Amino acid sequence: SFPFHPVGQTFTQRKDQTLSNITSTAFAMGSKGSSLDSQPKLGFNPKLYQDSKWCHDTPGTVSEDQVINIFTQEEIMKVLPMLPVVPRSISLKVGQTLFLAGVARLDVLTGPGSEKWQNHPLVLTIFASDDLPINIVETEQAEEFLSQGLKSDILKVPSSRQNPQRLEEFPELQGQEFELYGISDEESSCDIVLSSVGWLAVTTRVTLSYLVKAWTPGGKGLYLRDLAFLPYSVNLKGSKIRGTPYYGQSRIFIP
């Protein structure tokens, strides 16, 4: 959890008692000459306990694979989904690169060896915050695109809008190669985990294989999940948008 504002106190002794009165009383505890002893004590009141509001903050673990700790508060608001995640699907061919904002990247290095299937696309279903834009470029232009995109702030994260030195502080993207195999055009075979940013579900025809390279800041949290977490999510994609590698989004019922 990331509290951005003070958590107030809901217990009061009287309806007209303010939070400032309560906190001043709390800070007066133990001081000489305090009138605390003359004030009525606030004991346990089951009804008051039931009607009050609570914020429970459970302790988390710190992992070297987490990238969430490198983001500023402004960036966290974009990286962490504030609404239910709606999967977005794209198709990539050999020699193309996917950028997820400026915090993750995927290159398709090689594809099926068969001439019949060498142009068959690799479908990726992206599970990440909608505030992280998706861009697809030719791999040979990827470095230039990333450099220009970060300077112009179109990638959104990392952002140098408030701190011009932010791009110098932000860890460079580092990559790791993975070999992928397909099982069906209607079922994802595996996931590429991108640390705290999200993951990519991989879908392609059975027997086809690809070599890809995934990137995250500092190369942290890159894993291949052998079994897709949501293997049939690829079927939620809409029709292919003509002339682009993007699929439309089907309407998803969220209760």
Task: Give the location of each predicted region.
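Helix-rich effector regions associated with P-loop NTPase G domains
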Residues: 2-255
